[in-house]
Amino acid sequence: MILLSFVSDSNVGTGEKKVTEAWISEDENSHRTTSDRLTVMELPSPESEEVHEPRLGELLGNPEGQSLGSSPSQDRGCKQVTVTHWKIQTGETAQVCTKSGRNHILNSDLLLLQRELIEGEANPCDICGKTFTFNSDLVRHRISHAGEKPYTCDQCGKGFGQSSHLMEHQRIHTGERLYVCNVCGKDFIHYSGLIEHQRVHSGEKPFKCAQCGKAFCHSSDLIRHQRVHTRERPFECKECGKGFSQSSLLIRHQRIHTGERPYECNECGKSFIRSSSLIRHYQIHTEVKQYECKECGKAFRHRSDLIEHQRIHTGERPFECNECGKAFIRSSKLIQHQRIHTGERPYVCNECGKRFSQTSNFTQHQRIHTGEKLYECNECGKAFFLSSYLIRHQKIHTGERVYECKECGKAFLQKAHLTEHQKIHSGDRPFECKDCGKAFIQSSKLLLHQIIHTGEKPYVCSYCGKGFIQRSNFLQHQKIHTEEKLYECSQYGRDFNSTTNVKNNQRVHQEGLSLSKAPIHLGERSVDKGEHTGNL
């Protein structure tokens, strides 16, 4: 094995030598042209019986004080061994820097280090006060304050303050992943990514919360967790002002306003805002219901649904409103309820600007603009926006009236109609007119009444321009122009254009009134036959 080193004559008179650089060559033509003399020394191979480890003085010259001459032909086929490498192997130290305390094998390395060091133990940044030992580190740090990014990526044009950061970034384009986990084989672009990943295997959690003691693998996870204690919500929605502790939660929330649903079911095409909702939806197609209630036998696809269902049997309502004390089985129902107190309506229709507190109401409302009617009656083919409307409609065909009044026995198709009817017995009239004090059982009746005070007649006949307060009167009036007569007298077969006129006709037969004295109803007014004197 042959060791090559370049030695320069620093003082010709004394013969003093100094190592300035060391390198290896496989080809004599690759040697630099230099004034330095080449010192060649034969070293014993590791296989030889007598192994001699020379001192640094022996590497720089002849042990007996005589210079070893050499010719260029002697270094053919030399191995890659340098003075620096040799000193690392033997552990011998040549020089110690008085400023940094570092050991250096070559005097040239020591000189380079001393040029880097600035006078004084710490060299602070004049902007932020951070201290650095080396001038090059301070220069790189100052670039970060200036915002200067002199290193630009050729692929995408992104700029960086340090060349090392550019080199790391370029691995994204090349796909190079130098750092490999020796446990699972996963590779990473950045060394920091490998270090963080290895904590998964080691179980190390160095980042601990000072408030509750919970520990985390990553500092970013700790920062997010601390917002639970501080209630900080730095990510704010520009549409509604709602704040979030994580940027990912803000991005997901913004889909409510944009209507974006990136997760689509391959089976039926239904799309979702969250990936978790899509995963839950997929089980509808597989029809797997593995969680069964022991009380009633009802089965569920998700364990969480079973737990919620069991609260019906136990009566447990763990989610309580702080404002009014009302309790709920589900947390989602509590969140919806709390919007009554806060007045929050986060779901905004892009078509008309109407706001909603619940996603279900918002989705249903959008069908008004799209004209989509998903729920169709099998009996008559009539379609509806809501499933509840279809269920209510189907009772017309079945004749089912499940809501019966306990006072009078009258039955109704809808629970809302029963509730309104019961106010007749209780005398409850919760809807009062602010102008005259008149009270009504139904809110719709109050709205109709208030039009009397405003004088508004929203229903205008397109034939004659006459206005009406109530839609029912407007529809009856239009039948005069269309000559539509839907109601027939059961005794004489006479046709009428309203149920009111049919009832009046029946009263004529029952009371034995002459047709000449029976009133004729025209629209909203009734005229006696005796008054037909040409004033009409």
UniProtKB/Swiss-Prot annotation:
Residues 57-77, 513-536 are annotated as: Disordered. InterPro entries: Znf_C2H2_sf, Znf_C2H2_type. Residues 522-536 have a biased composition (Basic and acidic residues). There is a cross-link at K445 (Glycyl lysine isopeptide (Lys-Gly) (interchain with G-Cter in SUMO2)). Keywords: DNA-binding, Isopeptide bond, Metal-binding, Nucleus, Repeat, Transcription, Transcription regulation, Ubl conjugation, Zinc, Zinc-finger. Gene3D superfamilies: Classic Zinc Finger (3.30.160.60). One of its GO terms (biological process) is regulation of transcription by RNA polymerase II. SMART domains: ZnF_C2H2 (SM00355). The keyword Cell membrane does not apply. GO terms for cellular component: nucleus. Residues 64-74 have a biased composition (Polar residues). Pfam families: zf-C2H2 (PF00096). May be involved in transcriptional regulation. This is Zinc finger protein 623. It comes from Homo sapiens.
